[in-house]
Amino acid sequence: IRPDEAHHPVTRLIALENTHNRCGGVSLTANYTRAVSNLAKECGLLLHMDGARIFNAAAAQGVPARVLAEPADSVTFCLSKGLCAPVGSVLCGSKAFIRQAHRTRKQLGGGMRQAGILAAAGIVALETMVDRLVDDHARAKRLAKGLQGISGLELDPGTPYTNMIFTGISEQIPQDTREIVTRLAELGVRVGVTGKRRLRLVLHYWIDDAGVEKTIQAFKEVLVG
């Protein structure tokens, strides 16, 4: 929160991400979010939650998503990540807030025509995909256990918290990161690059038990030979 100083922009909003991507998919508790919400109110600020994967956070903690969202003034969540819809996100807030957001969207030209078919997919996601997120988390644990046994991989302590695995690549591995990613892709495994020698793997509906084993074997082939 910036001080009241003419050279700085005025702080109006605190934004939290749940789950937190760059921290390895860790989920924020309702108590933590409520403490931040209280701080925001004391300072006359609003609290927004980027809840792209809030249902993963809820699944990890065994609580309804609304419990994690309640302390925030506004929340967004993604339909196309863990919930596996083809596209879409949802903005949540008070009626007055949504009314203003709708007007702002119109002003910016962000409306879509005949988007009902996308909404239908989102409804299916909310009705059928939430309860199975724990399966992704379980597979992430199995994948992490398999990767931990491969020389040259340096998994973050505590990972995975939810459905994401972050791992470093030891300097003892001669290949550079892009070469490793390319070889994995040739073996049918796609991973993200989040740093010079750092990878991210995300578990989702389309990764089954066979996919977990395939990923472990692909890493062994690329890094160990």
Model-based region annotation:
Residues 1-157, 161-187, 192-207, 215-223:
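Conserved PLP-enzyme active-site core in the AAT-like
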